[in-house]
């Protein structure tokens, strides 16, 4: 039986959604929170590749860089007049810094589990509600790419 496949960014978003609404509901650990952030990063990476591929097809760029960070920086440079894109990519860069940073756990296995990270000189407290916001913004980015680069 033929089953239509979805683009990779939507698959990663589904996995992130499961982590957010199922796994975190029952486990409430910072490891699940970090995995969710990694899934959001992967969804961004696939969407950035999609946007750059469309730009390459239209002749705006010659080559697509190999590293995810270089691809995102190139997309940011090519769309620097687009405030929405700048906001979305700023969140992506923050995700990458959070993923690589040292972190502390607070109230793990409890309702208010918190992942605290030092980012650019300030502490960021990531809670489940914060992750919901990040998930929704990532979803918005993927839809933005789909609407503007398809």
Map each language-model feature to its residues:
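Charged alpha-helical initiation segments
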Residues: 1-35
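Short low-complexity stretches enriched in small and charged residues
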Residues: 1-5, 52, 92-99
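Short hairpin/turn module used for nucleic-acid contact or packing/dimerization
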Residues: 2, 138, 147-150
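A generic "alpha-helical surface" signal
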Residues: 7, 34, 38-41, 129-136
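Amphipathic, well-ordered alpha-helical segments in soluble domains
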Residues: 12-19, 39, 46, 134-137, ...
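Secondary-structure edge/capping motif, primarily at the C-terminal ends of alpha-helices
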Residues: 16-27, 50, 54, 145-149
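N-terminal interaction modules that seed assembly of large macromolecular complexes
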Residues: 25-58
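Long, charged low-complexity segments
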Residues: 58-142
